[in-house]
Regions:
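Residues forming the flavin
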Residues: 1-291
Length: 291
C-alpha cells in the first residue's frame, strides 16, 4: 500500500492487485465469521484491503532508525490517524480508525492515478530470461510489467508455494509460535501503577516479559500486547485455528491480552524451504481439532 502511495506521489500509475475484498466488505465478512459464520479464505483477518495490519491494533513501534518512518507517520495522519502518533513514545491508531485510514489511503492512490483491483489474486508470475514480465490474475487475465512489488505477508502460503515452484531463491528462517493469553485490564494496571491505577490521568497499562534459556537456546516472550483489546479468530484456511489480538482506539474493553511465544528454527521443523509452513499447519489443525 505504501509502495503504491509513494509511486503515485512521484508520477507513476501503479496497479494494485489485492486477493481479498475492500475494507468495508472485508469487515462484514469478518464480523459474520466471528458470529459463527463460514470463513471466507480470501476475505478475513489476514487477507483483504490493508492486509493483516488493518485488523491489528495499529501499534506503530519499530526498532529501525530511518528518516522515512516520519513520512509513514505523516501519511497515516493525513489519512485520518490521530495526530498524537507523531510524538507519543508508543503510538497507537486502533483497529476502528485503521479501517478509515486504509480507505483514505486507497482514495489518495486512486486520485493520483493508481488503480486498485480487489478479489484479484496473483496466480502466476510471468518470467522470461530470468526477468519478471508480468503477473496472471485469478488464473485468467495477464498484466505486463517491468517491475513487480510483492507484499506477501506471512499467510499467503499458496503464493510461497508458487514462488518455490518457479525456482525463486528462498530459504527457511526462524519464527515464533505460541498462544494468546488474557487478563483483566485492572490486574495489569494495578501491577504497573500501584494503588493509583484507577487515575484518569493514566493510560491503560501494558507489559513486556522475556525469558531466555541460554543452555537450550530457547526464548519465551510476550509479543504484541494489546491493552483494553480482544483476542480474535484470525484463520485464513479452513479446518485450522489462528488467533490474533487487537485494540480499538480507546482501548476500553476491560480485557488485556498478549501473545506468549517461543522461538523455533529449521532444526525444529526441517530445513526444506516449505517445512515451516507444514509445521504451522500441523499445530493450527491440532488446535482446530481440540476445539
Amino acid at each position: 500500500m505504501f509502495s503504491a502511495l509513494v509511486l503515485a506521489k512521484n508520477g507513476y500509475r501503479p496497479l494494485i492487485f489485492e486477493r481479498g475484498s475492500d475494507v468495508d466488505t472485508r469487515h462484514q465478512d469478518i464480523e459474520k465469521f466471528w458470529q459463527g459464520g463460514q470463513l471466507k479464505e480470501n476475505s478475513n483477518v489476514q487477507f483483504g484491503e490493508g492486509g493483516a495490519g488493518t485488523f491489528s491494533d495499529g501499534k506503530l513501534t519499530t526498532r529501525i532508525n530511518d528518516s522515512k518512518i516520519t513520512d509513514v507517520i505523516e501519511a497515516f495522519v493525513e489519512a485520518g490517524a490521530p495526530p498524537e502518533i507523531k510524538y507519543l513514545h508508543k503510538p497507537h491508531i486502533g483497529t476502528d480508525i485503521l479501517r478509515i485510514v486504509v480507505k483514505n489511503i486507497r482514495e489518495k492512490i486512486k486520485a493520483l492515478g493508481g488503480e486498485i483491483f480487489f478479489n484479484s489474486q496473483v496466480t502466476d508470475f510471468i518470467i522470461k530470461d530470468d526477468k519478471i514480465c508480468g503477473v496472471e490474475i485469478n488464473h485468467k487475465e495477464k498484466f505486463t510489467a517491468s517491475d513487480v512489488f510483492l507484499g506477501i505477508g506471512h499467510s499467503a502460503r499458496d503464493t510461497y508455494e508458487l514462488l518455490y515452484s518457479k525456482g525463486i531463491s528462498m530459504e527457511a528462517k526462524p519464527f515464533a509460535i505460541g498462544v494468546r493469553i488474557e487478563h483483566p485490564q485492572d490486574l495489569i494496571d494495578k501491577a504497573q501503577y500501584g494503588e493509583d491505577y484507577k487515575s484518569e490521568l493514566l493510560p491503560v497499562a501494558d507489559y513486556s516479559l522475556t525469558y531466555n534459556n541460554r543452555q537450550k537456546g530457547r526464548s519465551v516472550y510476550s509479543f504484541c500486547m494489546c491493552p483494553g483489546g480482544q483476542v480474535v479468530a484470525a484463520a485464513s484456511e479452513l479446518g485450522r485455528v489462528v488467533v490474533n489480538g487487537m485494540s480499538n482506539y480507546k482501548r476500553n474493553s476491560g480485557i488485556a491480552n498478549s501473545a506468549l511465544l517461543v522461538n523455533v528454527t529449521p532444526d525444529d521443523f526441517g530445513h526444506n524451504v516449505l517445512d515451516g509452513i507444514a509445521f504451522q499447519r500441523h499445530y493450527e489443525e491440532m488446535a482446530y481439532i481440540c476445539g
